[in-house]
């Protein structure tokens, strides 16, 4: 059995519901939990926190993401790093798919650089 796995197209692993949201786990072990979240336009993931650090990447669509009270208008290609317990919410302005990677190993230290702008 290989020590890797490949997902050639993440967008084929979730369906956006007509009204609502869906979460599909792609991988889960003692280190990370990776899930695809699909939202129909107008759906919201209300304010919440995660117990571990996480990365969010918008793969499709547009969203208003609120991080610790600060609103960001984001679209495909946007990438976010959040420390544990950062209050956040996501409002899908259009049909949207987001990849969430939660770091479950509390001993992992993340060094976050400055924001990259082009």
PLM regions and their residue ranges:
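A short, N-terminal "cap"/entry segment at the start of jelly-roll beta-barrel domains
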Residues: 1-31, 66, 115-118
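Structural motif
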Residues: 33, 62-64, 71, 87, ...
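Short, conserved beta-strand element in jelly-roll/cupin
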Residues: 38-40, 49-65
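Short beta-strand His + acidic residue motifs that chelate non-heme Fe in jelly-roll/DSBH
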Residues: 45-47, 65-66, 82, 87-93
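Ligand-binding loop in jelly-roll beta-barrel domains
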Residues: 84-108
């Amino acid at each position: 059995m290989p020590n890797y796995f490949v997902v050639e197209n993440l967008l084929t692993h979730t369906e956006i519901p007509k009204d609502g949201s869906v979460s599909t786990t792609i991988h889960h072990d003692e280190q990370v939990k990776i899930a695809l979240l699909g939202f129909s336009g107008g759906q919201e993931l209300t304010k919440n926190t995660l117990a571990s650090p996480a990365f969010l990447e918008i793969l499709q669509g547009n969203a208003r993401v609120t991080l610790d009270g600060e609103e960001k208008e984001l679209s495909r290609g946007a990438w976010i790093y959040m420390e544990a317990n950062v209050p956040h919410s996501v409002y899908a302005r259009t049909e949207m798919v987001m990849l969430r990677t939660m770091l479950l190993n509390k001993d992992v230290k993340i060094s976050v650089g400055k924001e990259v702008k082009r």
